[in-house]
């Protein structure tokens, strides 16, 4: 090889290294499908003392996808997509009462608990927005609000007195009323 050819080849090799030009041994890119994941929320412990978890956007989204679990018991009846179970069992865990519990105690139609921490109607309206509805109430001095992710008789309800939440029910409920 003459000197000119060597200079040209070494210059091309150097330029290729500097600018990243070269052969690749990688395989060409392939389109891959990725599974969509639904938001999931799990709560453990006493809920009444820490009821502000119901304002968390992850919790609210879990209601939309029937992926909420409380103290190891799944509440899969928040959207109306799943049919209400036929079980009549009840279980009490911490400060919560579960109704419609299956025989394995892994699933329930609803859960209810009294709220002892501060949770206001204003906070509910900010978190749930237009999805929050005022329900008719027969008890003087109390009001009930509910949110139904699937616009059916499922979701979450809040019993209030003096604009403070006193009780929360999650799961199967009768939701009617006016939207805000």
Task: Map each language-model feature to its residues.
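Short helix/turn-capping signatures at newly exposed starts of structured segments
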Residues: 22-131, 177-180
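Hydrophobic residues embedded in beta-strands of well-ordered beta-sheets
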Residues: 106-108, 143, 165-166
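Extracellular structured ligand-interaction cores
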Residues: 110, 153-155, 165
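Extracytosolic low-complexity repeat regions of secreted or lipid-anchored proteins
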Residues: 121, 127-157
């Amino acid at each position: 090889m003459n000197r000119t050819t060597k200079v040209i080849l070494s210059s091309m090799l150097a330029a290729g290294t500097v600018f990243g030009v070269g052969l690749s041994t990688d395989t060409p890119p392939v389109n891959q499908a990725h599974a969509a994941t639904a938001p999931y929320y799990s709560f453990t412990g006493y809920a009444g003392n820490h009821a502000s978890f119901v304002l968390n956007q992850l919790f609210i989204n879990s209601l939309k996808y029937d992926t909420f679990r409380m103290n190891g018991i799944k509440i899969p009846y928040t959207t109306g997509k799943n049919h209400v179970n036929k079980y009549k069992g009840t279980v009490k865990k911490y400060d919560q009462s579960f109704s419609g519990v299956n025989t394995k105690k892994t699933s329930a139609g609803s859960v209810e608990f009294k709220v002892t921490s501060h949770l206001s109607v204003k906070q509910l309206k900010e978190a749930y927005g237009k999805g929050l509805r005022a329900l008719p109430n027969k008890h003087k001095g109390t009001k009930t609000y509910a949110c139904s992710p699937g616009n059916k008789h499922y979701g979450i309800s809040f019993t209030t007195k003096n604009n403070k939440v006193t009780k929360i029910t999650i799961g199967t409920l009768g939701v009617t009323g006016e939207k805000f």
